[in-house]
Amino acid sequence: MTIDPDTAKLGRTPGLDEEHFAHDGLITKHPVRAVALAALRPMPGQTLWDLGTGAGSVAVEWCRTDPTCTAVGVERRADRAANARANAENLTAPGQFTVIDHDLTEGLPDGLPTPDAVFIGGGATAELVGACLAR
């Protein structure tokens, strides 16, 4: 399930400690991630949009629940998108979590797959929520 065999021992239960993620200090903390994943209720084969993904911790946790779950993270800051990509590479299966560099104030990026769930990690606006609901 993971590229790094050392991360296999972490299991699939959401709530990985922050030490397992590349991040700049701005990360959804592990208790919040565990509760968010319980509310999102990932099922095999489902897709998550993680908007304002930052380190990608919610998307990573989503993907780790089942090897057929996928996620797309959208992040405007290149440094945070790079951290999310590193976390995708180290903590999920290849191709399971994709990160798109995009500023959500310009709307949703083109070509996103239809989501089964959406997590807005930062910058939630009425317009963004409306755009998500319209999909």
Feature locations, PLM:
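Short beta-strand element of Class I
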Residues: 68-72
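Redox-cofactor binding/interface segments in oxidoreductases and associated redox assembly factors
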Residues: 119-121
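A short glycine-rich, Lys/Arg-flanked "PGG" loop and its adjoining helix->strand segment in the class I
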Residues: 129-135
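Conserved SAM-binding loop of SAM-dependent methyltransferases across substrates and taxa
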Residues: 55-67
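S-adenosyl-L-methionine
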Residues: 74-117, 126
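Class I SAM-dependent transferase core
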Residues: 1-44, 49, 83-86
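Conserved S-adenosyl-L-methionine
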Residues: 52
